[in-house]
Structures are given as structure tokens and as C-alpha cells.
């Protein structure tokens, strides 16, 4: 398994991982599919804060962070996203990606990482708790997908 900074050539594979999750799960509330062009723009704007896991030449997942909120007062706080192909879950890849993302975050002066985890994703909540994130709040019924309202669990880790 190789962890490395995402490159534009990864955009189609990243979009494919995202779109499988968007189309078939409540892990994310979004229903808007990702495009390779949009991913290329994200890679360009995030630089080393967009990490991919490559296994035998194929992407198995990615982790990235982005501004939590606008304004200079939030400059050292980031929200992150980690997504894995279904076959890659439960084998420790998520821990590896997050350890590398946290290393990059510390090097870039990030103080606080946030996760917004779907209440429909208890595995995601457990994963984040296991790597040191603290549940801060549950926002009831703020997401709507697949014809139903869903909760969002906010989790934070001080680096």
C-alpha cells in the first residue's frame, strides 16, 4: 500500500469512489455526483492535504481536509473527509490515511480537525472515536436523503 499526495491523474478514480458512496449510501447526504474536473480543482487547491492510498496501481481510498468555515479566525480548523472503497474497509487503511492526514495537518499548522459523520454510519462514528475524535454534538434531522431525515454527528480532534 502506498500513501501519496493526490495528483490530477487520480481524479477519475477518486470521483468513482465518491460516486459509489453518493449513489448507494447515507455516508454522505449529498446527492450531487463528483466529476473528475471538480476533483482536479480540489487537488490543486488542497495540495498535500489530499492524500490517496494506492494498492497495486489502483486507488483504494482517500483522505482530505478543507476549510471548516470562512474567515481568518477559523484558519487553523479544518473539516476532513475520508472515503474508502468497500473492499478496503476494516483492514486498517483508514487509520493509515488519517495518520498521514494528521501529520500533514500538523505540519501546516492545523490545530483542530472536524468530522461530520452521518448518524446512519455507526461504523464511521466508531472509527473516528477509535482514532481520538470526540463526539461534540448530534444535529438531529439536518440531512435528507433516500426520502428520510438523518442526523449528523459532529466530532472533533485537537491536534
Cite the ranges covered by each PLM segment.
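Conserved catalytic-core motifs of GNAT/GCN5-like acyltransferases
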Residues: 64-67, 72, 114-117, 129, ...
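Conserved beta-strand-loop-alpha-helix junction that forms the acyl-donor binding cleft
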Residues: 89, 115-125
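Acetyl-CoA-dependent GNAT
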Residues: 31-87, 98-99, 104, 158-159
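A short beta-loop-alpha structural element at the N-terminal edge
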Residues: 2-16
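Conserved acetyl-CoA-binding loop-helix of GNAT-fold acetyltransferases
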Residues: 90-103, 126-130
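Conserved GNAT acetyl-CoA-binding A-motif
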Residues: 105-117
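Glycine-rich phosphate/pyrophosphate-binding loop shared by adenosine-nucleotide-utilizing enzymes
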Residues: 1, 58-62, 150
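Helix-loop element at the rim of GNAT/NAT acetyltransferase active sites that forms part
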Residues: 16-33, 42
